[in-house]
C-alpha cells in the first residue's frame, strides 16, 4: 500500500476518519469501559501488563512533579505512576466520562487521588508551561496527532518530558500483513467474549484502517522533532507493532 508523505499524512487521516473520531468512538468506549482493561489483556495474549511496564520503565520522575496523562482512559498509567511516586500531582484528561468513572473508582479503591478532566484533548484546558511530565498512550491513532504533539508541547514546562506509547505501523511489509490479520481475528474474538455492542463491532475495520495509514516508530520520531521536541528517543517492540517514545521540550527557544 502506497502511503502519502508525512507532509500530507495528517490531512489524509483526518479526511478518512474525522466522523469516527468525533462521533463513533465515544459510543464504543461507553460500551466497553467496564471491561476495557480485561479486553486488552485478552487481545494482547496476556502481554498488556508487560506493555505497560515497558512504557513505565521509560518514564523518569521526581517527587512532587505535576503530571498530565492525556487520553487517560481507566487511569492505568496514573495509578502506576502514583505507586512509584505517591507525591505526584496527577491530572487525567479524557473525553469519555464512562472510562474516567472506571478509572476514578480504581484510583480511589487504592487510596489515590487523580484530578479528572473531561474534555476534547485536542484543546488542552491548561495554561502554557504548566506540567513537568506529560504521557499519552494507546490513543494516538484516534487523534490529529501532529496537532496533539504541538498542544502537549505547549503545556509542558521548558525542559519537561513527554512520553508516548502506542500500536504503530510495522515498517516490515510481511510483519505488517501478519499483524493486521491477527488484529482482525483477535478484535472479533474479544468482541464476542465481552459481548460488545454493534457500535464497537462496527469499528473493527476502522482500527485496522487507522493503523494502515498511521506512522512507523521512525516516522513518529520525525513528527516529534517537527513539532519542536528535542532529545527524541524511541523503542520499537515486536518489529514495530508497538512503539515507545520519549522527548523533551527545549529549555529555551532556539
Task: Give short role names for the model-derived ranges.
Residues 122-134:
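A short acidic, Gly/Pro-enriched loop at the edge of an enzyme's catalytic core
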Residues 228-254:
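Core SAM-dependent methyltransferase catalytic element
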Residues 133-146:
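A short SAM/SAH-binding and catalytic strip from SAM-dependent methyltransferases
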Residues 160-167:
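Conserved beta-strand signature within the Rossmann-like core of class I S-adenosyl-L-methionine
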Residues 146-158:
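A short glycine-rich, Lys/Arg-flanked "PGG" loop and its adjoining helix->strand segment in the class I
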Residues 66-123:
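Class I SAM-dependent methyltransferase SAM/SAH-binding core
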Residues 45-63:
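Conserved alpha-helix/loop element of class I SAM-dependent methyltransferases that forms part
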Residues 23, 169-223, 233:
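C-terminal alpha-helical "lid/dimerization" subdomain adjacent to the S-adenosyl-L-methionine
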Amino acid at each position: 500500500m502506497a502511503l502519502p508523505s508525512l507532509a500530507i499524512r495528517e490531512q489524509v487521516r483526518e479526511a478518512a476518519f474525522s466522523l469516527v473520531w468525533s462521533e463513533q468512538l465515544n459510543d464504543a468506549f461507553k460500551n466497553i469501559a467496564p471491561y476495557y482493561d480485561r479486553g486488552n489483556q485478552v487481545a494482547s495474549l496476556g502481554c498488556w501488563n508487560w506493555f505497560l511496564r515497558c512504557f513505565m520503565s521509560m518514564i523518569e520522575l521526581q517527587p512532587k512533579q505535576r503530571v498530565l496523562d492525556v487520553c487517560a482512559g481507566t487511569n492505568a498509567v496514573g495509578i502506576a505512576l502514583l505507586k512509584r511516586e505517591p507525591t505526584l500531582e496527577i491530572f487525567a484528561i479524557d473525553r469519555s466520562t464512562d472510562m474516567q468513572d472506571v478509572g476514578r473508582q480504581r484510583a480511589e479503591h487504592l487510596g489515590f487521588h487523580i484530578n479528572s478532566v473531561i474534555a476534547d484533548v485536542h484543546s488542552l484546558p491548561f495554561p502554557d508551561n504548566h506540567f513537568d511530565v506529560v504521557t499519552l498512550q494507546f490513543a494516538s491513532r484516534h487523534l490529529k496527532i501532529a496537532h496533539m504533539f504541538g498542544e502537549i508541547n505547549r503545556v509542558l514546562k521548558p525542559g519537561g518530558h513527554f512520553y508516548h506509547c502506542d500500536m504503530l505501523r510495522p515498517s516490515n511489509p510481511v510483519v505488517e500483513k501478519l499483524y493486521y490479520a491477527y488484529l482482525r481475528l483477535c478484535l472479533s474474538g474479544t468482541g464476542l467474549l465481552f459481548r460488545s455492542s454493534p457500535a464497537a463491532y462496527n469499528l473493527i475495520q476502522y482500527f485496522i484502517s487507522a493503523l494502515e495509514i498511521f506512522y512507523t516508530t521512525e516516522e513518529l520520531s520525525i513528527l516529534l522533532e517537527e513539532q519542536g521536541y528535542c532529545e527524541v528517543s524511541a523503542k520499537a517492540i515486536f518489529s514495530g507493532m508497538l512503539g515507545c517514545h520519549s522527548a523533551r521540550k527545549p529549555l529555551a527557544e532556539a
